[in-house]
């Protein structure tokens, strides 16, 4: 293994290049800082990333470096959120599962990919570890590969491997992965989790996200049997279910006996569980999020969250009004794939009201809010006040159902808005 310094490695980046930085908790921070240190020598470098969870704000995303770097994110996480909402960086709306197509088709050409990889095995293969998602296709489409070799990166199996002969420069950078603390569900989240868990049958295949409500759902599944996992992000919450044999993947049609994800984020406990574990398969996001793959599994239960839902079932999950908070991610991919699965169900979960007392069920979405899941795709909506099924319901019927799970303090106001919008059609709904 021939190693060079980070400063030497990033000299392969030229002005005008397009650079992809591996995301999730796999950000190669040694390489990112070395690239940023070359700002005075570089101009017009496009820097792409997605769901990059760093220890601090991205160092290249600063107003004073705008002539050197143009930061672009497909899904906003903590290290670019401030820069994007200040206009220093930009977000590209895209379904996560379709971004590899943008790379492979040349619509977004890439010159350089920066990776954070495991040490090579005896055959010279390094693992991308906890993040194959976009990295797999980015490597495939880039002219130059620069890798930070990290003894803390777990070795995972599936798509995320690269031979040292394919890497143009390798740098030693032993950094523990960023840990994402497990969110302990509060009482509201537990009530929502219980409503959703009651709809999940034995033998279901789970897609479940990150946060208090997903963890509450997982906590409520400990009496279930023969569950499977085919998800975008694998977190700590699924590990106890796997270890107890509740998630055994025995009834899945694709990768039976193995859990499937495209990225993993959580505590060191999760990373230790993944290291060398062939019971977990990490795949390219173009594969994990393909609805035609998702639908092959039985009883797909897609559990996702939202920022607000309007009375017709339009779901905003990426922004708070005009302020970008996250991105589309794989919500659409799994809502669609889950709907096509035999016995599948798709859930959107959210508290009925914010901590500031603002209703999350609204007459119309806030000005500037993005529609991540359309009202044509909406199925189950759950709050702490219940769960309702919107599919095949008229707009007036949907409004009636959604008002029934809104916070009691706003139901009268929502009813007035519904009458004004739907008129006699709303009044006729039983």
Show the residue positions of the predicted features.
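Conserved alpha/beta enzyme-core scaffold
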Residues: 1-430
């Amino acid at each position: 293994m021939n190693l060079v310094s980070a400063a030497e490695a990033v000299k392969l980046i030229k002005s005008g290049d397009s650079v992809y930085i591996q995301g999730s908790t796999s950000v190669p921070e040694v390489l990112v800082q070395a690239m940023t240190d070359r700002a005075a020598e570089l101009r017009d470098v496009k820097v792409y990333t997605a769901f990059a969870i760093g220890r601090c704000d991205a160092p290249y995303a600063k107003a004073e470096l705008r002539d050197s770097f143009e930061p672009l994110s497909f899904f906003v996480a903590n290290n670019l959120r401030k820069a994007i909402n200040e206009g220093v960086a930009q977000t590209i709306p895209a379904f996560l599962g379709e971004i590899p197509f943008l790379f492979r088709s040349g619509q977004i050409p890439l010159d350089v990919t920066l990776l954070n990889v495991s040490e090579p095995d005896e055959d010279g293969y390094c693992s991308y570890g906890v993040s194959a998602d976009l990295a797999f296709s980015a490597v495939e489409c880039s002219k130059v590969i620069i890798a930070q070799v990290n003894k803390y990166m777990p070795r995972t199996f599936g798509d995320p491997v690269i031979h040292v002969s394919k890497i143009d420069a390798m740098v030693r950078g032993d950094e523990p992965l960023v840990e994402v603390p497990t969110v302990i569900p509060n009482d509201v989240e537990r009530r929502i989790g219980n409503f959703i868990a009651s709809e999940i049958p034995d033998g279901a295949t789970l897609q479940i996200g990150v946060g208090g409500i997903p963890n509450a759902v997982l906590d409520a599944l400990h009496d279930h049997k023969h569950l499977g996992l085919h998800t975008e992000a694998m977190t700590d919450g699924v590990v106890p279910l796997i270890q107890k044999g509740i998630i055994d993947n025995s009834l899945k049609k694709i990768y039976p006996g193995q859990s499937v994800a495209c990225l993993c984020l959580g505590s060191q406990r999760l990373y230790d569980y993944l290291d060398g574990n062939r019971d977990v398969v990490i795949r390219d996001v173009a594969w994990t999020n393909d609805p035609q793959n998702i639908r092959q599994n039985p009883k797909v239960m897609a559990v996702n969250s939202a920022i607000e839902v309007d009375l017709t079932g339009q779901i905003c999950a990426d922004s708070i009004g005009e302020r970008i908070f996250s991105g589309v991610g794989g919500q659409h991919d799994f809502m669609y794939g889950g709907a096509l699965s035999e016995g599948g169900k798709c859930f959107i979960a959210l508290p009925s009201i914010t901590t500031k007392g603002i209703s999350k069920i609204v007459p119309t979405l806030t000005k500037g809010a993005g529609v991540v899941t359309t009202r044509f795709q909406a199925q189950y909506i759950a709050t702490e006040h219940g769960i309702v099924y919107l599919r095949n319901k008229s707009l007036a019927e949907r409004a009636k159902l959604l008002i029934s799970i809104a916070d009691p303090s706003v139901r009268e106001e929502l009813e007035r808005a519904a009458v004004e919008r739907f008129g006699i059609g709303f009044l006729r709904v039983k």
